[in-house]
Amino acid sequence: MKSKLWKLAGILFGVLALSAMAHAGWIDPDAAMAIGVIGNMTNAQARVVDPILSTVAQGYKNGRMVADFLFPVVPVDQRGGKILEFGKEDFLLYNTARAPGADTKEVQFGHLGAAYALEGHRLMGKVPFEHLQEANQVPGINLGRGAVTKTQNIILLASEHQAATIARNAANYAASNKTALAGTSRWDDYVSGISDPVADIDAAVEAIRAQVGMRPNTVVLSPKAFKAAKRHPKIIDRVKYTSRDSLTLEMLADLFDVERVVSGDAIYNNAGTMTDVWGKDVVVAYTEVATADDGGVPSFGYTYRLRGNPMVEMAYQDRNAKSWIYPVTDERVPVIAAAAAGYLIQTAVS
């Protein structure tokens, strides 16, 4: 018994001595120390972190991203199925009167349209052992959270770009639900007196209302369109008596008479050129943002996402790269459910 105690004491003394010498700068921690001391998270510990980091990924929001305003998330349990699409009948007022003995009218909300298939998006965040050494801590919530949020930000950018590509595709709209501004009609023409952002939004609102019986509640502006709008003489003239020094998105929402106006400020690297995800366009739509658990509510679009995603898988050590790896998976796809509830204004600015 005494010999075992002496052995344990010797091992403990050796570890403390090595640690003290490393902190004092007498020796450099080698790979074994990085893996055995700083990088020593057991599988049980990793399993504890996984649900926490999955919650981080699921709750993470980037203020530059606005896709969810046009394509609110609907959790699904299958990776494929039919899009629940909506026609004009889903938005119109019904005569609910019933005569004695008459049959009760039936209403079916939505119909199964084109097939959808969730797309799997997966990216792995890396935390090098060297960073852990410098931070003098084991890999856990803090560095893991940083790796997950940065990885999730990249996945969100890809999702934003995909949604913007769909929303900005003129082929997805009927002729009555799109326009392309040109020349003096563009919002950044302040001289001719012809361009009029408010009139353009009013026309979009009326086009949607006339078809689906509901006023659109969302306007997504590209950053260039937002910049042009808040500097436009006709808009400034309408708000010049307010106490604000500069025009805000909330003020534009009041002016356009919609619930929300958002600016899609995300950019991406396009062959070395930083490019606006939302280009020069404007999208007006009726969307039901509060439909996360109900896919049966009419809306311009949805993002079908596998329930429980995004998901952070069990962290593991890559000893060759001397790093902890945090895989993040997100299975989802944005779809248009009611094209008549959207309106596209292309090339709102030059």
Where are these regions (language model features)?
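Charged, low-complexity, helix/coiled-coil-prone segments
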Residues: 77-100, 131-149
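A structural signal for short, well-ordered beta-strand segments and their strand-loop junctions
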Residues: 218-222, 262-263
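N-terminal secretory/membrane targeting signals
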Residues: 1-27
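Alpha-helical scaffold segments that mediate packing/assembly in large oligomeric complexes
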Residues: 129-215, 223-237, 350
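Sequence/fold signature of self-assembling virion shell proteins
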Residues: 2, 23-97, 112, 116-119, ...
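Hydrophobic, aromatic-lined core segments that form the binding pocket/scaffold
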Residues: 102-106
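Short acidic, glycine/tyrosine-flanked loop/strand segments centered on an H-E-D-like triad
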Residues: 110-136
